[in-house]
UniProtKB/Swiss-Prot annotation:
NCBIfam families: PRK00103.1-3 (NF000985), tRNA_RlmH_YbeA (TIGR00246). Belongs to the RNA methyltransferase RlmH family. Gene3D superfamilies: 3.40.1280.10. It is an enzyme of class 2 (transferase). Its main location: cytoplasm. Pfam families: SPOUT_MTase (PF02590). This is Ribosomal RNA large subunit methyltransferase H. GO terms for cellular component: cytoplasm. S-adenosyl-L-methionine binds at L76, G108, F127, G128, L129, L130, T131, L132. Keywords: Cytoplasm, Methyltransferase, rRNA processing, S-adenosyl-L-methionine, Transferase. Homodimer. It is found in: Cytoplasm. It catalyses: pseudouridine(1915) in 23S rRNA + S-adenosyl-L-methionine = N(3)-methylpseudouridine(1915) in 23S rRNA + S-adenosyl-L-homocysteine + H(+).
Length: 159
């Protein structure tokens, strides 16, 4: 299985980079992980809704260019479905059983994701109503992917 994380914005914080590297290393037993960082658009102060939509559309075009035609796409969106860890693990397993070998997770920039990217998604997923920096969300997501594989293995990691 191949897991791709497409993210908008550059990760600068060393502690987050180290955490993501650790979970990527742990996941290498189960899958290949690729992190794709895309440039985020500069948002003017007091930007209008139209300007925000244009920014999300431009970011969306860059995201779309990195999605494979046969990828199962999961976007992180506040309006998405929330999963307990066990159910998320089952969902990833079901995706693989249904013939998808490439799963792409997408984390948008500070404005979120364009409508086009949300429409391309096979699944919209949410980690709740909290607002988190998208850089921190990368670490949370990759830890949950690792946890999902450990649940599938019956590992005590999840306990």
């Amino acid at each position: 299985m191949n897991i791709k994380l497409i993210t908008v914005g550059k990760l600068k914080e060393k502690y987050l980079t180290e955490g993501i590297a650790e979970y990527t290393k742990r996941l290498s037993r189960f899958c290949k992980v690729q992190v794709v960082e895309l440039i985020d658009e500069k948002t003017p102060e007091n930007a209008s809704e139209a300007q925000n939509n244009q920014i999300m559309a431009r970011e969306g075009e860059r995201i779309q260019a990195k999605i494979g035609s046969r990828d199962y796409v999961i976007v992180l969106a506040i309006e998405g479905k929330q999963f307990p860890s066990e159910e998320f693990s089952q969902k990833l397993e079901a995706i693989a059983v249904n013939g998808y070998s490439d799963i792409t997770f997408i984390i948008g920039g500070s404005l979120g994701l364009s409508k086009a990217i949300k429409q391309r998604a096979n699944l919209k997923m949410s980690f709740g109503l909290l607002t988190l920096p998208h850089q921190l969300m990368r670490l949370v997501l990759i830890e949950q992917i690792y946890r999902a594989f450990m649940i599938q293995q019956g590992s005590p990691y999840h306990k």
